[in-house]
């Protein structure tokens, strides 16, 4: 990563500037227009802070199948956090950084998990980026302040190490309690996304252990119903067991600092549903199961 010199952001009185320039032009002369600066904002990242960013604190990669709309959403979300600088003592909000997941911002309709099922929704796939960032933050020794698991385990990260988000409802956030600022850098390619968290060598952990301490099964149930319009008995909803998972984060630094955190995930079981075409068929099945 290379850095170039920063420049302040200036907001001018546009109406006054145009009026002054119009006056000069209407007179058929040349001259200088008076410019009133309404607002000035200094760069978020100073040259001094940029020079302190000299090492990768932690990074993580997740992979995904090629799907045009979902890929596009992942790309947009990854780009939206690229270049974010979080000063010491400040916090990062994923929802704030990525903004509204809307068509106006380029997001497309793609599958999202709702109550354990895939349903179409604008911005499907952004959770892959928040999950990737969560794991990079864990490995960097950062303090996670907001994180929630999905309704069901996902396939692109170990169980208990996912981070779902929902605009205005569920956020992923971390607090920078390190000595120096951290800089987020994302690398998107079709089929994978990598997030690097860069910082100062003084803040690079000397030891990181992310372990799964518990992975208990929560059995699902099988329910039945009758639908006379069906031509055959069949399993209409494929359920799965739930999980209760505990993941711990243990971090050490060379100067003696330590950090420990625990993350609890409860994935609800989803019932299996078998639909019979008649009550007698259901009873026959139940009798067979008992024998």
Where on the chain are the PLM-derived regions?
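Well-ordered beta-sheet/strand-loop patches within structured domains
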Residues: 1-291
